[in-house]
Regions:
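Enriched for short, Lys/Arg-rich terminal
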Residues: 67, 71-91
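Short connector loops at helix/strand junctions that flank enzyme active sites
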Residues: 54, 63-65
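Basic, Lys/Arg-enriched alpha-helical interface segments
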Residues: 2-56, 76
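A beta-hairpin/wing motif
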Residues: 58-60
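Short, proline-centered helix/strand-breaking motifs
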Residues: 46, 65-66
Length: 91
């Protein structure tokens, strides 16, 4: 499987990392590590996570209140968004 990250998701990830690093030293790195683990799980088990629409799935991070929204087409996983669950609950 090939992972692609949309520009929107990339900026959301960077914003979250920056925010967490301002809260506590290296917390942003911990966020990114949790995100990478979740992306690896998506890559290894792309159909594990539930559909929220016909073609979009959601994976919830383990340690942070964020969800990864992605689509699966053939051998490409496209990460559309990495959204905070409380700030954007109906994202």
């Amino acid at each position: 499987m090939i992972i692609k990250i949309s520009q929107k998701a990339f900026f959301e990830i960077e914003d979250a990392k920056e925010y967490y690093n301002l809260q506590q030293n290296n917390l942003g790195d911990t966020f990114k590590s949790d995100l990478k683990n979740s992306i690896e799980n998506i890559k290894n088990f792309p159909n594990l996570y539930p559909n929220i629409t016909n073609d979009m799935k959601r994976c919830i991070l383990h340690r942070f209140p964020y969800s990864i929204f992605y689509t699966l087409k053939q051998d490409i996983i496209l990460i559309l968004s990495v959204a905070h669950q409380h700030r954007k609950p109906f994202y």
